[in-house]
Amino acid sequence: MENTNQFLGTERVGKLMRRYAVPCIISLLVGALYNIVDQIFIANASYLGSYGNAANTVVFPLTVVALAIAVMIGDGCCAFVSISLGKGEVGEARKSVGSVVVLSAASSLVLTALYLIFADAIISMFGGTVNEETFRYAQEYFFYISLGIPFYMFGQAMNPVIRADGDPRFAMISTLAGAVLNIILDPIFIFECKWGMMGAAVATVLGQIVTAVLAVWYLCRMKTVKPGKGDFRLHASLCTRMLTLGITSFLSQISLVAAMAAINNMLRKYGALDEIFSQEQYAQIPMAVVGIVMKFFQIVISIVVGMAAGCIPVVGYNMGAGKKTRVRELFTKLLLCEAIVGAVALVLAEGFPRQLIAVFGAANESSYYTDFAIKAFRTYLCMMVLACVNKACFIFLQAVGKAFSSTMLSMIREVVFGMGFALLLPRFFGLDGVLYSMPVSDVLTFVIAAVMIVKTYRELNTEGAAVL
């Protein structure tokens, strides 16, 4: 089969960034909207309110576990396919796509079974016992979300593979179709049918099914790396290489889950010691508030990750073809764009927190909810620029084949700093300590990331001149 991706090594870098990054950003934003839209409609339903918001916050990390596995498989395959095409090894690329289908199906079924069997214990582990209402809502939401895990994981795993095949537009459309259906069904199920948390979850699952079906349709019509019947099996050596390339994506997401578990439990623990939030009717507020702050953060990070991940096929192809100058140029543009995104997000979080929380039903809540939410936005997100640059650095290192460096940097951010400070700082500052944990982590991570950025520039500088 002819390699039709040669333009990745000749087209202007800026044009390639727009072509690949924009659809990827939209895909990730739309994917993020599943949970965000659920939370918006849940929060604005007076019969659910902050209890439903808190329940959504409890369950959200558990969907991230599924996403972590899916992106490890999909991003790893995307990088592998791009590098293989750059080397002219189309057959290897086809085999890797077949392995993705089998691997995503098997892993999603195992995860679904674990979620259904150990649901109550898992919900408790992620802070769902803050009060009885929150636990009950979390149980209901988690059950139906678990049933959709196989569709969700397959759609997410195939999305980067479709981009690597040279059709980022279809990758965007498949995700957009499911999200649009979710947005349409959410208000119908929550407000008209009064299905509550079940309605939000069912709307989400139906949207995920649509995305998965479209991914199957594309799989049968792939342009460059369509697998043959014999390719639909687990090729051990290829799987190892793919998962190695995708391990950073996995650890980045899964370590975020660990950090969120720590944060949720610290909110529950130190909220119980607070004069206001120790009262039963207000106990869920800290968790609900941090949940909406994280949703805003998720929107921003979707743009950041989409921009960087969208460049993976371009980086992989040019690295495989030995065109380091083009890779260096792309890295420079990427860092600049990510810093701009972070600056815009910072202005919104610091200058307009009241307007942001109003989207999540603040009108139905007490002044304690609003006051804590404003403080959370301004404190938790005060280092957004550094957070965006850090994230871009993680993904770019992965794209150029430095899986170990990327993995270590990601783990240091989320586990050593993120989880560590989430557990440590509340001992000294109470609930405020949870809010301080993110900016402190981002500053310390940037110090390490800056060293990696300089080193990467030097390695990509084929003429040996200093770049930074």
How would you name each of these model-derived features?
Residues C24, L28, I40, A79, ...:
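Transmembrane alpha-helix boundary and packing residues in multipass membrane permease domains
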Residues G14-L33, V37, L62-I69, L147, ...:
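Residue-level signal for short hydrophobic patches within transmembrane helices
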Residues S50-P61, A138, F142, A201, ...:
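Small-residue hotspots at the loop-to-helix junctions and early N-terminal turns
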Residues S27, I145-R163, A171-A179, A200-V213, ...:
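Short runs within selected transmembrane alpha-helices of multi-pass transporters and secretion channels
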Residues R19-D38, Y144, G178, G207-T211, ...:
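Transmembrane helical elements of multi-pass membrane transporters/channels
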